[in-house]
């Protein structure tokens, strides 16, 4: 029988690594609580139509990367490749953005894309999503950027990330620009890279995102999207930059930043780093003011961003910003297997009274000698011995494992006071 192994592109989080996730997740919650965002939990399976209508049928994600299947009823379902579409569906279905309501939400969970696995890019990956609905003004644009900035500062990596900004204008602006771009690229058709040629028919704006040097040289003299954007939207983008200057948030303008999802409008942004090679983007987002209406809801202003958790962890590890793991327990109990009904009751009472303590024991209840060896390896500060003699006399034995102190005896009814010191 062949050995069963993990699916390519998927990863186990081993016990030795889970503390890194717990550390990052605790920082995420700290920051989002500070800005009064509410957590929501979304299903990992949605109807395929949701992503066709939101992410876009011509996008690389929907056309090449989604995990699609039919259930036993013949319904076409998809493992979510991103979180925004599902969050919008949830908001519409539960009437959370009707009659002028506003919502500030966040979620964190696994997403799925069939991509070539490499460092920082996996077929199952965890994503933090932050979404806000019903806010029209610049203030919410600044707030969502400030949330990411605050998280990076809290993690000690703000000097290693760069905010890149662009404006995509309105849908009409993009249509007009797309026609101008196609007209410009016509004479260069044969010189474009293979992916860019495919995008000419499906999603021409994505050509701006090409990393191929030859294509970038062709684009150097192409029409600029900013020249096709309405005056009001251009002014709004300029004001956003001015406010970021006032907040002390460093940024640079990137006129080729277009994002790979069809639903973005107006402001788009990415946080990038030069520490992770080709997988440089760790956070990306923007406004998507038309998406709620496109999916059947009322016209609703919306903005959000997503952070790739694995990439952020890789960056933290590379920069030495993760805390050292501390698996050591505080107290190790050494028990007589013949008297477990009494001694286990004492241990459980202490766990209830002192929940902050990490308490362990040898559940095989070997000899006292073997239990002491395990106590030494556990990293515990003290070992508490409860054998037959201790039970008969009403005192627990206390052995200090990290200090050169003599063994003590403490009455059972004083153990909690002793451990609190």
Curated annotation (Swiss-Prot):
Transmembrane segments: none annotated. Keywords: Aminoacyl-tRNA synthetase, ATP-binding, Cytoplasm, Ligase, Nucleotide-binding, Protein biosynthesis. HAMAP family: His_tRNA_synth. One of its GO terms (molecular function) is histidine-tRNA ligase activity. It is an enzyme of class 6 (ligase). It comes from Francisella tularensis subsp. holarctica (strain FTNF002-00 / FTA). Homodimer. It comes from the Bacteria. It catalyses: tRNA(His) + L-histidine + ATP = L-histidyl-tRNA(His) + AMP + diphosphate + H(+). The gene is hisS. Its main location: cytoplasm. Belongs to the class-II aminoacyl-tRNA synthetase family. It is found in: Cytoplasm. One of its GO terms (cellular component) is cytoplasm. This is Histidine--tRNA ligase. GO terms for biological process: histidyl-tRNA aminoacylation. Its EC number is 6.1.1.21.
